[in-house]
Curated annotation (Swiss-Prot):
It comes from the Bacteria. The keyword Aminoacyl-tRNA synthetase does not apply. Residues 1-45 are annotated as: Disordered. GO terms for cellular component: ribonucleoprotein complex; ribosome. This is Large ribosomal subunit protein bL34. GO terms for molecular function: structural constituent of ribosome. The keyword Cytoplasm does not apply. InterPro entries: Ribosomal_bL34, Ribosomal_bL34_CS. Keywords: Ribonucleoprotein, Ribosomal protein. It comes from Synechococcus sp. (strain WH7803). GO terms for biological process: translation.
């Protein structure tokens, strides 16, 4: 039997694309800025 590989882990998602991770780098801050400008309700995961 094969493993379910499509589940997704919330901890991993946060570590890769959470708000605090975005704020660490210049490009991440640019992502947040762009999403704010577009009026996104969710800026990061």
């Amino acid at each position: 039997m094969t493993k379910r590989t499509l589940g997704g882990t919330s901890r991993k998602r946060k570590r890769v694309s959470g708000f605090r991770v975005r704020m660490r780098s210049h490009t991440g801050r640019r992502v947040i800025r762009t999403r704010r400008k577009r009026g996104r309700s969710r800026l990061a995961v």
